[in-house]
């Protein structure tokens, strides 16, 4: 048996699977979980793949990309995603997390897939809301958008950031779909003084890129090495990974030179 991952409209990968473990469908999402000899369990959410053995890569990178460039991380907002492992990593800081996800049926179906599902959901500093309007009005130190935001969502979310807050969003991979990344950077630059693309170094099973944006905080100049060294129980993230995430080959430096704001 095989499952197919669409990397771009013109590039696909296939993975061998042994069995389907779960099939859950809601109004807006489809979740299938498969057993794989090489990758443990594989979750397919709306044709995007999550590998249980490698969940820590994205969750560590995004959480500590924000946490280690901020002196304080008191209030965090996560929108448009299901990744509770990201919240688990963020709880390494003294923080409160607002997690916005309307599809409770799909979220609860990840109960056996996310290793820290119960630990996160039962944390007193974790608030799950179905929509942003259900939350108290506040400003955030870090906002993570786990789907590509359109320009209207960017505008709304940036208004919820503190002056030194950090906004991290998913984008297309800069090498695979550089035009899409270029457009995303251009849009982000309409709202932020800092807008820089990055990827997860050595992550071979992903088609994702990301953007780090802020009014004043810089992902490299404001990196705090002592905070990185103090992190416990991390398997992927370190200072070298953080810095390498922003490295671009010469040709992409030229492509993005008018869109990167640093």
UniProtKB/Swiss-Prot annotation:
Query: Which amino acids does the record list as binding S-methyl-5'-thioadenosine?
Result: 29
Kindly list the GO CC terms recorded for this protein. Answer: cytosol
List the active-site residues: 155
Q: Would the keyword DNA-binding turn up in this protein's UniProt record?
A: no
Which keywords accompany this UniProt record?
A: Cytoplasm, Polyamine biosynthesis, Spermidine biosynthesis, Transferase
Q: Cellular location of this protein?
A: Cytoplasm
Entry-linked NCBIfam families: PRK00536.1 (NF001811)
The text of the family note is: Belongs to the spermidine/spermine synthase family.
**Name listed for the protein in its UniProt record:** Polyamine aminopropyltransferase
The species this protein belongs to is Helicobacter pylori (strain Shi470)
Q: Could you tell me the gene encoding this protein?
A: speE
């Amino acid at each position: 048996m095989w499952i197919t991952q669409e990397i771009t409209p013109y590039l696909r990968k296939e993975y061998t699977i042994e069995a389907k473990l779960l099939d859950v469908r809601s109004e807006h999402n489809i979740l299938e979980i498969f057993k794989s000899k090489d990758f443990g369990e594989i979750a397919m959410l709306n044709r995007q793949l999550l590998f249980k053995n490698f969940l820590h890569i994205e969750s560590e990178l995004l959480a500590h990309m924000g946490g280690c460039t901020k002196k304080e991380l008191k209030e965090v907002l996560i929108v448009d995603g299901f990744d509770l492992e990201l919240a688990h990593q963020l709880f390494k800081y003294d923080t409160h997390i607002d997690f916005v996800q309307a599809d409770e049926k799909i979220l609860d179906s990840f109960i056996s897939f996310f290793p820290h599902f119960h630990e996160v959901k039962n944390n007193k500093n974790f608030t799950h809301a179905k929509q942003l309007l259900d939350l108290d009005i506040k400003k955030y130190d870090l906002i993570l958008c786990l789907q590509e935001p359109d320009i209207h969502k960017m505008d709304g979310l940036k208004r919820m950031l503190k002056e030194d807050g950090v906004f991290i969003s998913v984008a297309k991979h800069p090498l695979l779909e550089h035009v899409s990344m270029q457009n995303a950077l251009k849009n982000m630059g309409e709202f932020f003084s800092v807008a820089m693309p990055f990827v997860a170094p050595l992550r071979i099973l992903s088609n994702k890129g990301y953007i780090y944006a802020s009014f004043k905080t810089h992902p490299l100049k404001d990196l705090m090495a002592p905070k990185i060294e103090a992190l416990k129980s991390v398997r992927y993230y370190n200072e070298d990974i953080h810095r390498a995430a922003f490295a671009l080959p010469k040709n992409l430096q030229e492509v993005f030179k008018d869109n990167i704001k640093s």
